[in-house]
Swiss-Prot record:
One of its GO terms (molecular function) is 2 iron, 2 sulfur cluster binding. It comes from Xylella fastidiosa (strain 9a5c). The modification N6-carboxylysine is found at K124. Binds 1 [2Fe-2S] cluster per subunit. This cluster acts as a Lewis acid cofactor. This is Dihydroxy-acid dehydratase. It comes from the Bacteria. Its EC number is 4.2.1.9. Keywords: 2Fe-2S, Amino-acid biosynthesis, Branched-chain amino acid biosynthesis, Iron, Iron-sulfur, Lyase, Magnesium, Metal-binding. Signal peptide: none annotated. Its cofactor is [2Fe-2S] cluster; Mg(2+).
Length: 610
């Protein structure tokens, strides 16, 4: 049987010094025979999705200790993409994913931890910890801080979120008072932003991957039911330790759970729920860490066969994550996919022998278990707070309407093709991605003239000064992982297009990426990126570009000869922006750019250069 990794620093006379230091942390004689379980917390006061996590690591720790383990907590960094948005701070967001992954690996390996609990929540933290867990391949459980409650104001009938505040702020017809009212109401509680944005998308995907407990992605941060998720995470990691170190059960390890089939399940869920396009980037990165050959081609293949069964903000103003939970949460969607024979139900999870068994237990349509029904009635209280587990409000009933409800069955899908698609063409030879869930059907085929910007800042200025007109395709390049560096999110350009009434009259194409809050004909992750010699760098103002989502195609309508001629010309002068940019790029960002791959590889480090 495998030995505890921690024996390296706790066993034998030569480790007297290490044990002396362990004792100084509070360990006693009996503790040196127990598994040492690392708790990677991501508490910070900078991020609403993490502001309430300070004491939750110790909540898990006490449960681990009660069940016979030794718990040791440490913290990672966490960047708030919304606060970093629209200025040079966004250059640091995606690179922070690698820093988080490295820091978890460093702490777990330096101290020979036997297992891991990941307390994550927002955009790059869950992916970074996911990458680390698959590198380490020690028993691991994920538990997130949970989603924020949606906001409310007397000015609108629909619920609010961060994107509403951004769009209204750019609307010249909105008064300062209206903007202030929405600003104060859009983000009322702690938790990850309330729509199907990147953070919530990733926390939902950990359920499909099998690495977190049911409800991880959908129980609001303020609800008392989430406390039980944290306690259960402590219990589950102890069980996983027993299974691996006691029985050498490989399905207790992240790589035994997050197999190729599990990655297919995760992207199938992602497509069905219309998740953030960032999830594609992060799943590809995680697959590489797991040494699973999961690629853009697999995503393209699945996107053609999976319908959209759930539609949540920003793709509609009717539903937020709290509504998904009321409709049965992620297991509600997984159950419908399973009924459509679109899932691998024989894969393992941290909490059940197989995903199929878990669906049978947690599907609100199929089970009569009142405890499960009560669990999925956990709802928002509508009280502004930064305190976790501070309310116990329950919906009076579940949303079991699979015809017109938040979650649909296969027959009544929002669309027969899912919410994400991969496009290929002469300006995206290795692919690009679009969240079709947020694209009006009338512009699934769109042709327009290119208006090229060499940076997000220039594009924002152009949109706000009315350079962009109906029928144009805004091209923003040199914003990829290497070219940015850091692959900025383009939420401001897309929000401003909406505020100008151009959401259905223009498209945006970039080698950067989009916030989970983005909707509209916004196509990102163009690969190869411009800085890596990608053809997006060859587009010129006035070029006609044709986007055809049904055919999964995007092309600039010029001859191959002209494209080749432009390539030779560009190669001679170098793949860099035509206009200089006043952008401060630190040595840390330059180091990231030196190794960064394009988005089709997950924007991970190019290991061939190491």
């Amino acid at each position: 049987m495998p030995e505890y990794r921690s024996k390296t620093s706790t066993y034998g006379r030569n480790m007297a010094g290490a044990r002396a230091l362990w004792r100084a942390t509070g360990m006693k004689d009996d503790d040196f025979q127990k598994p040492i379980i690392a708790i990677a917390n991501s508490f910070t006061q900078f991020v609403p999705g993490h502001v309430h996590l300070k004491d939750l690591g110790q909540l898990v720790a006490r449960e681990i200790e009660r069940l016979g383990g030794v718990a040791k907590e440490f913290n990672t960094i966490a960047v708030d993409d919304g606060i970093a948005m629209g200025h040079d701070g966004m250059l640091y967001s995606l690179p922070s994913r690698e820093i988080i992954a490295d820091s978890v690996e460093y702490m777990a390996n330096a101290h020979c931890a036997d297992a891991l609990v990941c307390i994550s929540n927002c955009d790059k933290i869950t992916p970074g910890m996911l990458m680390a867990s698959l590198r380490l391949n020690i028993p691991t459980v994920f538990v997130s801080g949970g989603p924020m409650e949606a906001g409310k104001t007397k000015l609108t009938d629909h619920k609010l979120d961060l994107v509403d505040a951004m769009v209204l702020a750019a609307d010249p017809h909105a008064s300062d008072e209206e903007v202030a009212a929405v600003e104060r109401s859009a983000c009322p509680t702690c938790g990850s932003c309330s729509g199907m944005f990147t953070a919530n998308s990733m926390n939902c995907l950990t359920e499909a991957l099998g690495l977190s407990l049911p409800g991880n992605g959908t129980v609001v941060a303020t609800h008392s039911d989430r406390k039980q998720l944290f306690l259960n995470a402590g219990r589950t990691v102890i069980e996983l330790c027993h299974r691996w170190y006691g029985n050498e059960d490989a399905t207790a390890l992240p790589r035994g759970i997050a197999t190729f089939a599990a990655f297919e399940n995760a992207i199938t869920l992602d497509i069905a729920m219309g998740g953030s396009t960032n999830t594609i980037l992060h799943l590809l990165a995680a697959a590489q860490e797991a040494e699973v050959p999961f690629t853009m081609q697999d995503i393209d293949r699945l996107s053609r066969n999976v319908p959209q069964l759930c539609k949540v903000a920003p793709n509609t103003q009717k539903y937020h994550i709290e509504d998904v939970h009321r409709a049965g949460g992620i297991f509600g969607i997984l159950a419908e996919l399973a009924r459509g024979n679109l899932l691998h139900t024989d894969v393992a999870t941290v909490h059940s022998k197989t995903l199929g068994e878990a669906i049978a237990t947690w599907d609100i349509i199929g089970t009569q278990d009142e405890a499960v029904h009560t669990f999925y009635k956990a709802g928002p209280a509508g009280i502004s707070t930064q305190v976790a587990f501070s309310q116990s409000t329950r919906w009076p009933s579940l949303d079991t309407d699979r015809t017109e409800g938040c979650i649909r069955d296969m027959e009544h899908a929002f669309s027969k093709e899912g919410g994400l698609a991969v496009l290929y063409g002469n300006i995206a030879q290795d692919g690009c991605v679009v969240k079709t869930a947020g694209v009006d059907a009338s512009i699934h085929v769109f042709e327009g003239s290119a208006l090229v910007y060499e940076s997000q800042e220039a594009a924002v200025k152009g949109i706000l000064s009315d350079e962009v007109q109906p029928g144009m395709i805004v091209v923003i390049r040199y914003e990829g992982p290497k070219g940015g560096p850091g692959m900025q999110e383009m939420l401001y350009p897309t929000s401003y297009l909406k505020s100008k009434g151009l959401g259905k009259q223009c498209a945006l194409f970039t080698d950067g990426r989009f916030s989970g809050g983005t909707s509209g004909l916004s196509i990102g992750h163009a690969s190869p990126e411009a800085a890596a010699g990608g053809a997006i760098g060859l587009i010129r103002d006035g070029d006609r570009i044709r986007i055809d989502i049904p055919q999964r195609a995007i092309n600039v309508l010029i001859s191959e000869e002209e494209l080749a001629s432009r390539r030779l010309e560009q190669h001679a002068i170098g793949w860099k922006p035509a206009q200089s940019r006043t952008r401060k790029v630190s040595s840390a960002l330059k180091a990231y750019a030196l190794l960064a791959t394009s988005a089709d590889k997950g924007a991970v480090r190019n290991k061939t250069l190491l």
